[in-house]
Amino acid sequence: MRGTSFILFAVVVILGFLHANAEPLANPAPLANPDPLANADPLADPEAINLKGLIKKVASLLT
């Protein structure tokens, strides 16, 4: 049983080493038709996170 766990550990270490040394794609292919209206960054849209409104809701629930 000890030998099996050592072999599994060695395989995991080797695969992790190979994964860490893998080179990322230099120029990944762009999306075929990206949506210009899609906003991937929620912080870029000021209406996406209404922190003041959230604080008011939490305060009203606590009182």
Swiss-Prot record:
Keywords: Amidation, Antibiotic, Antimicrobial, Cytolysis, Fungicide, Immunity, Innate immunity, Membrane, Repeat, Secreted, Signal, Target cell membrane, Target membrane, Toxin, Transmembrane. Residues 1-22 form the signal peptide. The keyword Phosphoprotein does not apply. AXPX repeats lie at residues 22-25, 26-29, 32-35, 40-43, 44-47. GO terms for molecular function: toxin activity. One of its GO terms (biological process) is defense response to bacterium. Residues 23-48 form a propeptide. Its main location: secreted. One of its GO terms (cellular component) is other organism cell membrane. It is found in: Secreted; Target cell membrane. Expressed by the venom gland. Antimicrobial peptide with activities against the fungi B.cinerea (MIC=5 uM) and C.albicans (MIC=100 uM), the Gram-negative bacterium E.coli (MIC=25 uM) and the Gram-positive bacterium S.aureus (MIC=100 uM). Shows cytolytic activity against insect cell lines. Has no hemolytic activity against human erythrocytes. In vivo, peptide injection in the vicinity of the head and thorax of lepidopteran larvae induces feeding disorder followed by death due to starvation. Belongs to the MCD family. Eumenitin subfamily. This is Eumenitin VP1.
